[in-house]
């Protein structure tokens, strides 16, 4: 029984660790992923080793499987809370909607406006880049001002230049000055 509990706890730790390592690899943070992978490998070997010691012990096998499943739920929750990386939203509008553009820029979102040809009329597309941790805030602003907008999104692997890079540098400097004044 104690072994089964240990296996369950190890799986609850192992699977979210696996999730985080995978995310770091996808985000091109290979050194961090390698560090997390050390922990992941150690947990995997210990947990599976206990199970393989006695394959007739069904409690250990059930603990492994249920722990794995619970770990997936926890890993997904952690991934959503960490919200590592950036996202781009493409927002299609019937009109230019300067109110939305100005509001998004006011709150620090990078917005580029494009004019295009729709099937029946001119359409406008906003390309908006944001940290994933601010996605909910972004969607609230869009839904408040342009609730009928068509939106699609994708995650960004990397980027260079543009408003967002300048804004990040500016925020970092302001934070540094604020921290220095706090001391």
Swiss-Prot record:
Coiled-coil positions: none
Primary location class: membrane
PANTHER family according to UniProt: UPF0316 PROTEIN YEBE
Disulfide-bonded cysteines: none
Domain of life: Bacteria
NCBIfam families tied to this protein: PRK04164.1-4, PRK04164.1-5
Family designation: Belongs to the UPF0316 family.
TM helices/strands, residue ranges: 6-26, 32-52, 58-78
Subcellular location: Cell membrane
Protein name, per record: UPF0316 protein BcerKBAB4_3093
GO CC entries: plasma membrane
Record key words, sorted: Cell membrane, Membrane, Transmembrane, Transmembrane helix
Membrane topology field: Multi-pass membrane protein
């Amino acid at each position: 029984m104690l072994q089964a509990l240990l296996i369950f706890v190890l799986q609850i730790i192992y699977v979210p660790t696996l999730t985080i390592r995978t995310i770091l690899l996808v985000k091109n943070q290979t050194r961090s992923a390698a560090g997390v992978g050390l922990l992941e490998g150690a947990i995997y070997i210990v947990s599976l080793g206990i199970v393989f010691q006695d394959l007739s012990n069904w409690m250990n096998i059930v603990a492994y499987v249920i722990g794995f499943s619970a770990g997936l739920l926890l890993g997904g929750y952690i991934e959503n809370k960490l919200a590592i990386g950036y996202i781009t939203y493409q927002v299609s509008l019937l009109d230019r909607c300067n109110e939305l553009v100005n509001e998004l820029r006011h709150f620090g979102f990078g917005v580029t406006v494009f004019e295009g040809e729709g099937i029946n009329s001119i359409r406008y597309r906003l390309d908006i880049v944001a940290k994933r941790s601010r996605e909910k805030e972004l969607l609230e602003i869009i839904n408040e001002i342009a609730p009928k907008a068509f939106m699609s999104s994708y995650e960004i692997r990397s980027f260079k230049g543009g408003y967002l890079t300048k804004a990040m540098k500016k925020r970092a400097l302001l934070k540094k000055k604020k921290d220095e004044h706090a001391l």
